[in-house]
């Protein structure tokens, strides 16, 4: 059976932690920032984690991560 391919678009956006969770960046921070409050922009700087409901999908996209 051939090797499974990693989806490179996903590999660039997610990093695995030591416990196996997936870290991700937050969306809505690239442009149209004038109407967003300072507090909102500050909170968007922090990373997030992939939810448990999405982890199974992510494992198929990133089989070797």
Curated annotation (Swiss-Prot):
Pfam families: Ribosomal_L35p
Single GO biological process annotation from the record: translation
Alphabetically ordered keywords of this record: Ribonucleoprotein, Ribosomal protein
UniProt-listed InterPro entries: Ribosomal_bL35, Ribosomal_bL35-like, Ribosomal_bL35_CS, Ribosomal_bL35_sf
Gene Ontology annotations for the cellular component aspect, listed alphabetically: cytosolic large ribosomal subunit
Any one Gene Ontology molecular-function term assigned to this protein's record: structural constituent of ribosome
Keyword Ribosomal protein tagged: yes
NCBIfam families with a match to the protein in the record: rpmI_bact
HAMAP family: Ribosomal_bL35
Annotated family: Belongs to the bacterial ribosomal protein bL35 family.
Protein name: Large ribosomal subunit protein bL35
Organism: Clostridium acetobutylicum (strain ATCC 824 / DSM 792 / JCM 1419 / IAM 19013 / LMG 5710 / NBRC 13948 / NRRL B-527 / VKM B-1787 / 2291 / W)
Species classification: Bacteria, Bacillati, Bacillota, Clostridia, Eubacteriales
Gene behind this protein: rpmI
